[in-house]
Swiss-Prot record:
Binding site for Mo-molybdopterin: 71, 74-75, 128, 163, 213, 218, 229-231
Cysteines paired by S-S bonds: none
Post-translational modification: Predicted to be exported by the Tat system. The position of the signal peptide cleavage has not been experimentally proven.
Requisite cofactors: Mo-molybdopterin
Stated name of the protein: Protein-methionine-sulfoxide reductase catalytic subunit MsrP
Quaternary structure annotation from Swiss-Prot or TrEMBL: Heterodimer of a catalytic subunit (MsrP) and a heme-binding subunit (MsrQ).
Subcellular location per the Swiss-Prot or TrEMBL entry: Periplasm
EC numbers: 1.8.5.-
Organism of this sequence: Agrobacterium fabrum (strain C58 / ATCC 33970)
Gene encoding the protein: msrP
Classification via CDD domains: YedY_like_Moco
Textual note on the cofactor: Binds 1 Mo-molybdopterin (Mo-MPT) cofactor per subunit.
Length: 313
């Protein structure tokens, strides 16, 4: 991944938390569904209604402009600004998510159906493997709720996820030389996927997901590095063996399957002991802060009892 460079954010572009919280009271699910239903058009941010989730943070939110303009989404290009600049032609509707594999009831879910799940707002830390972080108010629902619908078989041990392949709409997927193999694939153990912290997000900052942030639906696993949060999901499969994930296949020495946030296991090319929080600039720019084990979500530690987290990075 490219080296980290903190973005410049004009003060006029920063969404104050107080404004966001007051505006959220006027948001409605109907408007969100209406925008999702605009088939064949560019994604239009629309308000969503969500109940407050059980997981909250008493930390400053990352400015909305930074969340939507400083992204890794290689399907639109490898630069941090590429996803915002190059995703205008991407069509997040119509959209279906196929859930298959080792399940009793394989199904396809339209995005309109998924948007009708009881939505929660979850404010999570997001830690990128590159050494920077954000605090983002996501809107979504537990992945376990979707898995319950399809009834995984006893032989299912892992969950595999795939991003859509549309080179005509995603310029990072076209061209002779590709940075990665497509489709983008990620995976979790089934117990990780079922953990209450793991969600499928359909919005952020009170509105539907922008294209550059993974519209119309993406994975959020807050105790893992950000690249595990696969975007624009079109297929979820229950499988018996560990999925062959994209970054691990690209460079297994640098990107492991688990990729839990761990300040004690460095990336081969940089330390993971500290991070730079986007949007928190001091006199000398963005300041370093200590990285927390599991990104501060200690209740997942029991998932890895007896597992060597250095060998299984």
């Amino acid at each position: 991944m490219p080296a980290y460079r903190p973005p410049h954010i004009a003060s006029s572009e920063i969404t104050p938390k107080s404004f966001y919280l007051s505006r959220r009271n006027f948001l409605g699910t109907a408007a969100g569904l209406a925008a999702i239903g605009l088939a064949g058009r560019e994604a239009i941010a629309a308000p969503l209604s969500a109940k407050p989730g059980a997981y909250k943070l008493d930390e400053k939110l990352t400015p909305l402009d930074a969340v939507t303009s400083y992204n890794n989404f290689y399907e639109f290009g490898v630069g941090k600004s590429d996803p915002k600049e190059n995703s205008g032609k991407f069509k997040p509707t119509p959209w279906t998510v196929k859930v298959d594999g080792l399940v009793s009831k394989p199904q396809e879910f339209g995005i309109e159906e998924l948007m009708k799940y009881p939505l929660e707002e979850r404010t999570y830390r997001m830690r990128c493997v590159e050494g920077w972080s954000m605090v983002i108010p996501w809107i979504g629902f537990p992945l376990s709720a979707l898995l319950d619908k399809v009834e995984p078989l006893g032989s299912a041990k892992y969950v595999s996820f795939e991003t859509v392949v549309r080179p005509e709409e995603m310029p990072g997927q076209s061209g002779l030389f590709q940075p990665l193999s497509w489709p983008y694939v990620e995976g979790l153990r089934l117990d990780e996927a079922r953990h209450p912290l793991t969600i499928l997000a359909v919005g952020l900052y009170g509105e539907t997901l922008p294209n550059q942030n993974g519209a119309p639906i993406r994975l959020v696993v807050p105790w893992k590095y950000g690249f595990k949060g696969i975007k624009s999901i079109m297929r979820i499969s229950l499988v018996e063996k560990q999925p062959e994930t994209t970054w691990k296949n690209s460079n297994a020495r640098e990107y492991g399957f688990y990729s839990n946030v761990n300040p004690h296991v460095d990336h081969p090319r940089w330390s993971q002991a500290t991070e730079q929080r986007i949007g928190e600039g001091g006199f000398f720019g963005t300041q370093n802060r200590p990285t927390l084990m599991f990104n501060g979500y200690d209740d997942v530690a029991s998932l890895y009892t007896g597992l060597d987290l250095k060998a299984n990075y």
